[in-house]
Amino acid sequence: MLAKTSETVVLTIGHSTRTLEEFVELLEAYGVTLVVDVRTVPRGRHNPQFNKEALPISLKHFGIRYIHMPEIGGLRHPKHESVNLAWKNSGFQGYADYMQTQEFTDSLLKIIGLARETRLALMCAEALPWRCHRNLISDALTVRHIKVEHIIGKDSLIKHELNELAHVDGTRITYPLFTKETPQRTLGDFGSS
């Protein structure tokens, strides 16, 4: 008889305008031992407690590790031949384009490896996951059979559901704008650059 293996889970969290104490309280409430910072720019004027220089030191006092993974960060621009036209937000469209790269896949596999070893949370600034690139990262994890849950509050954990715009082919995920009657179009079809 095979032993039951535990499910790999990835949590996500947005630091938002929380105090460091509130943030750590949430991490501790959900047993997080590693924060993976998925911000491209890990600093801000309004919440300096979450800057890359300060946060690792603060978290260490609570026994929580920190790593920064800018290679999976947001702030991506759409490609000219993007197939991810279902996204109206250019930042999400650009990130969906980036998800087609080997760099994204390698970073995602690194996150999965870490999640198999420890309880981690992917962190960005935006509190609401559906307004953040964590939502797209979560889609990519979900199609790889990784359970994703979003930390909203102390008593609020939301299970990630694959975005309805998603088109899945194995572990490849795109967000095309198409119907059964019309073929997929790209930005190039509209003369956009």
Task: Describe the function of each predicted region.
Residues 1-193:
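Residues lining hydrophobic/aromatic ligand-binding pockets adjacent to catalytic sites
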